[in-house]
């Protein structure tokens, strides 16, 4: 006898200030990810533009705005450009480890430095270690933390300079949240490198896509995602190739915006 399928219940948040476009309001639809079919539900929702935050899947459903567009990199067709190849060579000595979704004091310390430098007034600015543990460890799906470290010395692990909370889905990997060292001049472009390394990892694993969350038209800090081509965007007719206007040369590297409450892990 097969288990009875239960259709998920969806809810809508109350409108609030948009963290990406001044003067706009945001609203989200969300559902709980729980039970034996949580991973399958997350996969299905991910293909129609939902993102995961702990045990919840959500997507924007704003009344008067459709600027948030789901985007994903076609991993097996991606070819790094000259500046991206330079970053790959520069950071080729980093030790990369795929870790279980358990938090460490070292990860939290790096997160605090990252938020102080990049998002001092954001919703995560007051996050404590318990909040961080909830963000990483409360997951009903296959997830892990990818760590990026300086080379080991005398048999001891090197300094942690980057990390990314990453979900593995049936058709790709979803980068939930990344953070990295921002004040080390010898390690420029770490955020970009982390994305490049995830694209390589997906392609080598036979996974077609790397989900980058939302590209937000009109938000300057979200434009870096268009540097990773070929890129697809989700519209009412499905996924289509997407090329945004050219961007300035890459600087210190990309990073995912800091979340505050439900729905800002995009």
Curated annotation (Swiss-Prot):
InterPro entries in the cross-refs: Acyl_CoA_acyltransferase, Asp_Glu_LeuTrfase, N-end_Aminoacyl_Trfase, N-end_Aminoacyl_Trfase_C, N-end_Aminoacyl_Trfase_N
Catalytic activity of the protein: N-terminal L-glutamyl-[protein] + L-leucyl-tRNA(Leu) = N-terminal L-leucyl-L-glutamyl-[protein] + tRNA(Leu) + H(+); N-terminal L-aspartyl-[protein] + L-leucyl-tRNA(Leu) = N-terminal L-leucyl-L-aspartyl-[protein] + tRNA(Leu) + H(+)
Keywords attached to this entry: Acyltransferase, Cytoplasm, Transferase
Compartment(s) where it occurs, according to its Swiss-Prot or TrEMBL record: Cytoplasm
GO MF term set: arginyl-tRNA--protein transferase activity; leucyl-tRNA--protein transferase activity
Pfam hit, one: ATE_C
GO BP terms, alphabetized: ubiquitin-dependent protein catabolic process via the N-end rule pathway
S-S bridge residues: none
E.C. numbers: 2.3.2.29
Main location: cytoplasm
GO cellular component, one term: cytoplasm
Entry function: Functions in the N-end rule pathway of protein degradation where it conjugates Leu from its aminoacyl-tRNA to the N-termini of proteins containing an N-terminal aspartate or glutamate.
PANTHER family tied to this protein: ARGININE-TRNA-PROTEIN TRANSFERASE 1, ARGINYL-TRNA--PROTEIN TRANSFERASE 1
Family, similarity comment: Belongs to the R-transferase family. Bpt subfamily.
Name of protein: Aspartate/glutamate leucyltransferase
Organism of origin: Rhizorhabdus wittichii (strain DSM 6014 / CCUG 31198 / JCM 15750 / NBRC 105917 / EY 4224 / RW1) (Sphingomonas wittichii)
Encoding gene per record: bpt
């Amino acid at each position: 006898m097969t288990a009875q399928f239960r259709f998920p219940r969806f809810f809508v948040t109350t409108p609030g200030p948009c963290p990406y476009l001044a003067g706009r309001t945001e609203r989200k639809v969300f559902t709980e990810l729980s039970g034996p079919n949580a991973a399958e539900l997350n996969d299905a929702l991910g293909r129609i533009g939902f993102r995961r935050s702990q045990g919840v899947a959500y997507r924007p459903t704003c009344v008067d705005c459709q600027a948030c567009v789901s985007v994903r990199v076609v991993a097996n067709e991606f070819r790094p450009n000259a500046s991206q190849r330079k970053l790959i060579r520069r950071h080729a000595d980093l030790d990369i480890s795929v870790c279980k979704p358990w938090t460490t004091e070292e990860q939290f310390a790096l997160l605090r430095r990252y938020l102080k430098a990049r998002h001092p007034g954001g919703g995560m600015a007051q996050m404590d270690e318990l909040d961080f543990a909830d963000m990483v460890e409360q997951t009903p799906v296959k997830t892990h933390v990818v760590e990026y470290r300086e080379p080991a010395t005398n048999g001891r692990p090197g300094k942690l300079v980057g990390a990314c909370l990453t979900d593995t889905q049936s058709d790709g990997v979803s980068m939930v949240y990344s953070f990295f060292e921002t004040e080390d001049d010898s390690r420029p472009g770490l955020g970009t490198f982390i994305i490049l390394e995830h694209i390589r990892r997906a392609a080598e694993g036979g996974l077609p896509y790397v989900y980058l969350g939302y590209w937000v038209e009109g938000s300057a800090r979200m434009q870096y995602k268009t540097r990773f081509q070929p890129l697809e965007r989700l519209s009412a007719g499905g996924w289509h190739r997407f090329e945004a206007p050219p961007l300035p040369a890459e600087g210190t590297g990309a990073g995912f915006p800091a979340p505050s409450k439900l729905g800002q892990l995009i």
